[in-house]
Amino acid sequence: MKLLTINSIEASSICDNKCDYCPAKEQGKHRDTGYMSMDVFRKALEWVEWCARRGTQQELNLFGVGEPTLNPNIVQMCRLARHILPNSRELHFNTNGNTMTEELALALKGAGITHIDVTLHVGYAKNPKNVSKTIQMLNENEMMRPGGISVDPIIRPNNWAGQVDWPDSGIRFQCPFLTKGQVMIMSNGDITTCCIDAFGRGIVGNVFDSKPEDIELKPFDLCETCHSRI
């Protein structure tokens, strides 16, 4: 499968939570982690623009395996991405809500973000009032979509293809990455064939030394234990 769309750009591969069901806390042992720099982000947007010119770019998620609002440039990133992304395509990300403020939310809305989804994970258990305020605030500012609250680790649990010790519900979905030509650009510019590739095992290139037209998407070892099917 050839590359068709940049599904995700990982604004941050660092998280301020340490959830048992998420590999974010361990991924620094396996790959470079941190906040995506503006140089890397601008280069990643060139790949988005390449897909957009061909009419294949779909939604863009500024979320990978980390908390995007920790990146101090997240508003600027949204503004630049909105300029490149076709108007009909959604620009969004997920947040744990820990650091979301109304000032930040309105700045993101002004920068062109379509919606923000909230994950009810460890942060909610520790500080439900703060995360509930975030949800209320985003709703009041029309920045959440119906069903924009994630409780997947409870109602549709999976073990991230064996990367964490967590129950697997057995629910199977078709893999959108290998069947629809999607990739995620990681915080250091590496390109992976899968959005749950926390440890960087499916790298197929880098935005600086690869060309979009040369990217080939193929199954890799995580596919064998993944909850998605090809």
Where are these regions (language model features)?
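Short aromatic-enriched loop/helix-cap "lid" or pocket-rim segments at secondary-structure transitions
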Residues: D20-C22, I74, L104-A105, P128-V131, ...
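Short, well-ordered coil/turn elements that cap or connect secondary structure elements
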Residues: G55, P86-S88, M144, F199, ...
